[in-house]
């Protein structure tokens, strides 16, 4: 009973990733570690957002530097601890930085494009979209040949999020093409249920 209560309290407080017992040994849905990392980030977000508005490049580089230091300086040199280290908040700061940068670039560019639209912009973005898809495919295939999958995942997390950022920005500015791909009813439906689907898929699959 004590272990179950500890497991439950850690999950409800979004602190389960801090202990091997409640993270690696949890009897609750294992994918809920993502909610813990996100909630920890939300605690920092008001400060980071304020810094990003004032000094976007410095804030981005600071988040990226902290994340890469944790990945390459702390985690990857300790392969025996990777399962515990790979999904801690510092490892994701670079991913969150890309998301904040994407929002910043989109907001800034949208205002300028509204004032001075570039009609041929979607045509220029099509090669960017194609290139991004090629990179995503290469990263996906690289995982199959990785000697240590957690190490590969940690090393590729920032490049992968960078490719996704590039792809989403390109699609967002690709006019009717982007709206057809991202704004249709089917994708809007899956967008609405995507996180719930992610939370339940492993729990159902392993049973």
Where are these regions (language model features)?
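Extracytosolic (periplasmic/ER-lumenal) interhelical loops and adjacent juxtamembrane/interface segments
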Residues: 4-23
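Alpha-helical membrane-protein architecture signal
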Residues: 5, 25-29, 94, 183
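Hydrophobic transmembrane-helix microenvironments that flank and shape a buried ionizable site
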Residues: 8, 13, 34-37, 89-92, ...
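Alpha-helical transmembrane segments
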Residues: 11, 60-68, 124-129
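Membrane-interface helix caps and helix-loop-helix hairpins in membrane proteins
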Residues: 24-28, 77-86, 147-151
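Specific transmembrane alpha-helix
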Residues: 34-50, 63-114, 131-132, 156-179
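Membrane-interfacial entry segments at the cytosolic side of transmembrane helices
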Residues: 54-62, 111-124
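Alpha-helical transmembrane segments of multi-pass integral membrane proteins
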Residues: 92, 96, 100, 121-207
């Amino acid at each position: 009973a004590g272990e179950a209560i500890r497991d439950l309290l850690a999950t409800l407080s979004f602190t389960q990733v801090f202990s091997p017992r409640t993270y690696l040994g949890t009897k609750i849905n294992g994918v809920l570690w993502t909610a813990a990392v996100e909630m920890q980030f939300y605690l920092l977000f008001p400060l980071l957002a304020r810094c990003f508005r004032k000094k976007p490049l410095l804030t981005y580089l600071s988040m990226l530097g902290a994340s890469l230091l944790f990945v390459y300086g702390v985690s990857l040199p300790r392969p025996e601890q990777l399962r515990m280290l790979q999904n801690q908040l510092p490892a994701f700061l670079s991913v969150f930085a890309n998301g904040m940068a994407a929002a910043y670039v989109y907001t800034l560019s949208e205002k300028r494009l509204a004032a001075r639209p570039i009609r041929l912009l979607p045509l220029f973005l099509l090669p960017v979209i194609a290139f991004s898809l090629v990179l995503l495919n290469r990263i996906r295939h690289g995982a199959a040949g990785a000697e240590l999958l957690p190490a590969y995942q940690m090393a590729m997390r920032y490049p992968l999020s960078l490719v996704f950022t590039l792809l989403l920005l390109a699609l967002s500015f690709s006019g009717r093409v982007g709206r057809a791909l991202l704004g249709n009813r089917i994708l809007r439906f899956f967008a609405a249920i995507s996180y719930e689907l992610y939370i339940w898929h492993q729990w159902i699959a392993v049973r």
